């Protein structure tokens, strides 16, 4: 890994956050944490296969600004579960800029969960807990079922599958906020039955546009209100969810 110039990184981070109205989330301490996160992620990338994005400019835009943009949709002091957290996005950036949030990051891959947990400890993020768990198991567990104000997910599965993996975690009155790709509108239209069946209502797709160094990123966020309890028959085993999505 090529050495990252700290001053250059801080300058780029500050510029991108300012251009996208995110400056209020930065402080000297938080910039230090984003720098430390970047160094650790790129150092550990070969071992854990964390990210295909290794250029600093793209990391700042695609990983940091993108995840921090989610913050505006999360109320103060909320509980958040990041389903399929992977390398810790959005959970790690959110934990850095929102110490008021109580975040649980879950993934079925133990080595990635270990990476997220160790990184959170290194950065002093006491508001983030990482757990190795399959979402369909956690959604049935009394410890986690309907215990969170928000569920987040980034690039995990198509919406019919994702809804069954995430909505069971969300309290009535909470929301699922899914960070999706270019097929978001189509996925949302095909997931109407799944959303209604699982207790979701009022689905909307919002396109978030962010400006970086010579690049513009448009990222759809799908937001679903949880209005009714999820029936006890859901989530089903993953083989059923994937073979026969709702």
Give the residues covered by each predicted segment:
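Class I SAM-dependent transferase core
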Residues: 2-77, 81, 118-128
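Short loop/edge segments at beta-strand edges and connector loops
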Residues: 54, 132-134, 206
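Conserved SAM/SAH cofactor-binding pocket of Class I
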Residues: 65-163
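Helix-to-beta-strand junctions that scaffold the AdoMet/dcAdoMet cofactor pocket
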Residues: 98, 170-172
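Short alpha-helix immediately C-terminal to the canonical SAM-binding loop
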Residues: 112-114, 184, 188
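Short "lid" loop at the C-terminus of a central beta-strand within the Rossmann-like core
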Residues: 136, 181-185, 210
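Conserved beta-strand signature within the Rossmann-like core of class I S-adenosyl-L-methionine
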Residues: 173-183
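SAM/dcSAM-binding transferase cores
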Residues: 189-246
């Amino acid at each position: 890994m090529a050495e990252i110039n700290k001053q250059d990184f801080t300058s780029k981070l500050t510029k991108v956050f300012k251009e996208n109205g995110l400056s209020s989330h930065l402080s000297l301490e938080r910039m230090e944490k984003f720098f430390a996160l970047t160094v650790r992620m790129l150092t550990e990338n070969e071992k854990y296969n964390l990210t295909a994005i290794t250029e600093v400019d793209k990391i700042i835009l695609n990983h940091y600004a993108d995840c921090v943009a989610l913050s505006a949709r999360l109320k103060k002091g909320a509980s958040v579960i990041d389903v399929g957290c992977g390398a810790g996005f959005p959970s790690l950036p959110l934990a850095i800029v929102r110490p008021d949030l109580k975040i649980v990051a879950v993934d079925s891959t133990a080595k990635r969960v270990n990476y997220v947990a160790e990184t959170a400890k290194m950065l002093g993020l006491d508001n983030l807990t990482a757990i190795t768990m399959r979402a369909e198991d956690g959604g049935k567990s009394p410890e986690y079922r309907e215990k969170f104000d928000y569920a987040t997910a980034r690039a995990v599965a198509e919406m019919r599958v994702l809804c069954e993996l995430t909505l069971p975690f969300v309290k009535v009155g909470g929301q699922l906020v899914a960070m999706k790709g270019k097929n978001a509108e189509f996925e949302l239209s095909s997931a109407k039955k799944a959303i209604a069946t699982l207790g979701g209502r009022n689905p909307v797709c919002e396109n978030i546009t962010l400006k970086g160094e010579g690049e513009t990123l448009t990222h759809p966020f799908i937001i679903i209100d949880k209005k009714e309890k999820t029936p006890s028959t859901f989530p089903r085993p993953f083989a059923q969810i994937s073979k026969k999505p709702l």
